């Protein structure tokens, strides 16, 4: 999963090591990280 995150965003996701689109509930947390979400 880590390599997938690194591949998609070009940087390690950190505390979250799974695709963001799987759980829309965590989207706000991902947004605070500063990742370009596909939502």
Curated annotation (Swiss-Prot):
Q: What cellular component GO annotations does this protein have?
A: extracellular space; secretory granule
Task: Provide a Gene Ontology MF annotation, just one.
Answer: hormone activity
Valine amide PTM positions read 13
Q: Where's it mainly located? A: secreted
- Would the keyword Secreted be found if you checked this record's keyword annotation? yes
Q: A Gene Ontology biological process annotation?
A: regulation of corticosterone secretion
> What InterPro entries does this protein map onto?
Mcrtin_ACTH_cent, PMOC, POMC-derived_peptides
Is the keyword Iron-sulfur in the record? Answer: no
- Coiled-coil spans are none
The protein's UniProt keywords, in alphabetical order, are: Amidation, Cleavage on pair of basic residues, Hormone, Secreted
Where is the protein found, in the record's own terms? Secreted
**Family according to the record:** Belongs to the POMC family.
Give the protein's biological function: Precursor protein for pituitary hormones that regulate stress and environmental adaptation.
Name recorded for this polypeptide: Pro-opiomelanocortin
Q: Which organism is it from?
A: Struthio camelus
Q: Which gene encodes it?
A: POMC
